[in-house]
């Protein structure tokens, strides 16, 4: 997501990650942003994202990256997901991204993006990462693993959340929005 009117930078030095112990994307995104916000002055954002499958009660959810274990690979996670969906007809799913924006470690706002799709019976495509080869996106007629990266970036859950955040920041900087004290 291009935001030429903003100078987005990474932290200037390596910082060990916090424990992501929340049960929601919102909690984990806020936890990370507030944690990393201690190391800089001003605005900082962090995200938490993952895949929710309706038939699995929203799993893998916040555990998407470590669904099959702490050291699991994408192939391990995809394999476990397919195993748990064996014989399941309803494979509706969504990618979710929540971005937490903080200023001086104080939570300012949360932004959520979602993209709906369904999980196939087998992976298709070598592009993307994570669950992309299993996630079929109807408007494209293919999986995110088969989609052109530029097309995927236009509709992704992360792109939606980022665009919402940049719109908010533009409003804030033009004084259309004010921060609570």
Predicted segments with their positions:
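Anionic-ligand binding patches
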Residues: 1-181
């Amino acid at each position: 997501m291009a935001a030429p009117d903003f100078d987005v930078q990474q932290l200037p030095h390596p910082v060990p990650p916090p424990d992501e112990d929340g049960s929601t994307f919102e909690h984990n995104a806020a936890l990370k942003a507030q944690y990393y916000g201690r190391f800089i002055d001003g605005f900082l954002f962090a995200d938490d994202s993952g895949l929710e499958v309706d038939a699995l009660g929203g799993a893998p959810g916040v555990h998407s990256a470590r669904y099959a274990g702490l050291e699991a690979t994408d192939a391990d996670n995809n394999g476990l997901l397919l195993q748990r969906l064996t014989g399941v007809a309803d494979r509706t799913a969504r990618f979710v991204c929540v971005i937490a924006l903080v200023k001086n470690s104080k939570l300012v706002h949360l932004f959520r993006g979602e993209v709906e799709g369904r999980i196939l019976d087998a992976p298709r495509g070598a592009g993307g990462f994570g669950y992309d080869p299993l996630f079929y996106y109807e408007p494209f007629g293919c999986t995110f693993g088969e989609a052109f990266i530029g097309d995927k970036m236009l509709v992704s859950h992360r792109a939606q959340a980022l665009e919402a955040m940049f719109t908010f920041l533009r409003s804030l900087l033009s004084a259309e929005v004010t921060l609570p004290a």
